[in-house]
Each structure stands twice: as structure tokens, then as C-alpha cells.
Amino acid sequence: MYKRQYETSGNNPQYGKYFFSPGIDYHNPVAMLEQRDDEGIRKEFSGSVNASLRIIDGLKISAMGAIIERSERYGHYYGRYYPVNIGNNGTAETYNDHYKNKMLEATIDYSGTFGDHKLQAIAGYSFSEESSESYDQMNYKFDTDIFGFHNIGNGGALKEGLASMGSSKEDNRLIAFFGRVMYNYKEKYLFSASVRYEGSSRFGDNHKWGTFPAVSLGWRISVSYTHLR
């Protein structure tokens, strides 16, 4: 559905050039665009490096490192004649955010077959660190719309204690040592055991580290009774 463009009467220009009338539900979409200013920029970088080395047949060491970094900055301004802003004399908002994530993992794994026996094992270390910061501000009651959100401190709401602002910061770190062994006999009987020793800044003060073991047994019935077919 499209809305028509309305030109205001030259005898009553007080509500802005294109509005038919303020405070009602039919406003010119062109005017709404002119009464609103949105700007933003987002920068993001991500990169990773992988390396592996085969020491002997069946034995390999690997390492992986990665980083993700992102920054965002946004600004919005709603003019005094914008439909939802009438009476506020302009509203300005700004938002800034920065995020960073660093990861590292190193492993050594082995795989070998001895007759009817097959063995696989892996051990490793992993590290992950995240950090984020954000800031936001909002102010209104401006004397003019000329400066938009670039003059956010001059809104009258700040002087009256009605403006708002906020900020946040969070850092998280995760470190883990892990290992896993898998064994099967004739692809029929299966065994697996794993353990992970993990420390996290998100854990409680008295429990920064935890051990997480797991064991499983299996039997492939289809393999056991294949000869009966």
C-alpha cells in the first residue's frame, strides 16, 4: 500500500512543508523521510590460521587460531514534525558498540588399526576470550533540527533530567583441556570415553573449574548377524 504525497497550504506552513496535518494517521511518506535522519557504520574483521603436521603414520598435531572484531556506530534523529515525535521538538539517539573474540585450539590425534582392533585418540587445549562494550544516549527538546544527532548534548531534556544514557561492558574467558579415546573390535563392539577439564569466568567464584567425563558402549547388532542372512 502506498501513501499519497500531500503539500501543505501556503497559508499554514507551520507543520513542515509536506505534512497534511500533524498528529493524525495519514502523513506523507516523503515528508517522513525528510524528517528522519539515520546514519550508521559497521566495520568487521575476521581471520583464521590453520596448521597441521603429520609426525608419523597415524599421528598428527594441529593448531588453529582465529579472531573476530566488530565495531558499530549509529545515529538517529527524528525532527519535530515526525509523526511519533510531535511535541518533543526533535529527538536524537546515538549508539556505539565494540566486540572482539579471540580463539585458539591445539590438538594431537592418533588413529591406528591392528588386525581386528581399531583405535582413535585425541587430546587438546582450547582458549576463547570475548569482550564487548556499548554506549547509548538519547535526548530531545532541541531548539533546531539543523544539527541532528551531532549536537545531542544541547537538547533541553538533558537540562531537565529527562534524557537517558547507558553503557555496558562484558568480558568472558574459557579455557579447556580435553581428551577422547574411541575403540572398536571388528566394527562390532564399540567403546568411547572422553573427559574435559574446563575453566570459565562465567562459573561461580568457588567453582571456576570443572571436570566433565563421559563414557559410552555400543554393539552393532546388524554386523553381528550379517552372516545369518
Language-model region placement:
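Surface-exposed loop/interface segments of Gram-negative outer-membrane beta-barrel transport/assembly proteins
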Residues: 3-44, 64-175, 223-228
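Residues on the lipid-exposed face of transmembrane beta-strands in outer-membrane beta-barrel proteins
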Residues: 47-53, 106-110, 123, 179-183, ...
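Short beta-strand segments enriched in hydrophobic/aromatic residues
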Residues: 53-55, 67, 112, 127, ...
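Outer-envelope beta-barrel architecture signal
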Residues: 57-61, 115-121, 187-189, 211
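Exposed, low-structure sequence patches enriched in small/polar residues
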Residues: 174, 180-182, 194
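Transmembrane beta-barrel architecture of outer membranes
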Residues: 176, 210-212
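Transmembrane beta-strand segments that form the barrel wall of outer-membrane beta-barrel proteins
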Residues: 191-203
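Short glycine/threonine-rich loop-to-helix capping motif typified by GTGT followed
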Residues: 205-209
